[in-house]
Amino acid sequence: MKIKTIKFCSLFLYVLLIFQLVSAFPISFSNKNETLIVKDSDAITGLPNRFRDLTNLNISGSAQFTPSQIENIKNSINKPDICIVDLRQESHGFINDLAISFYSIGKDLNNGFTTEETISTEDKLLNSIKQNSQINIYDKLGKVLTNITVDSVSTENNAINKNGLKYQRFAVKDGGIPSTTVIDDFVDFIKNKPEGQHLHFHCDAGEGRTTTFMVLYQI
């Protein structure tokens, strides 16, 4: 009898633990196959997360930034010729002053895409967002964070150019390694870049891909 009671209590505790975990991380399965607009950053002041400037190498790196932070990056680097090197394979851009990306809980979006395919898909997704429309902004668990009115939509390239900076894209999977094509393109880019041009690398979190390319630059 005691053994049955112990087994029952163990099962009850196990079910309770599972319930608590599900409650703590509520995934909305109703939209698991939808393409969601998720928030990458809403910072309006200061520099982006994990910003570091290696002045002796004329390179810097960071996490994803918002439109408001572009001028801060420019002023902090303080060089006449700056090129932003975007390493994200995931489609992303700016809505109002939010940095956003397109994400699916149930699908690996843009997996295997070339840089050109990534940019083409990104342009289509951003162009589908109409000014003055109401849209939901999600987190990566599928939870709605907020609903906003769209005042402006922009690619990172356009926002960068408006601030007098140059832009270059190399699409690398989050958590992955660059393809041989991307590495070859990056080597050609470095060989042909203007002398004295400062490169600012970024991905989403400013860690894996950003650090990888900052190291590749030194090889």
Name every feature range the model reports, one short phrase each.
Residues M1-F12:
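Bacterial N-terminal signal peptides that target proteins for export
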Residues L17-H200, T212-I219:
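Cys-dependent protein tyrosine phosphatase-like superfamily
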Residues R209:
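Conserved SAM/SAH-binding loop-helix junction
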Residues G206:
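Conserved G/P- and acidic residue-centered "switch" motifs that form tight phosphate/ATP-binding loops
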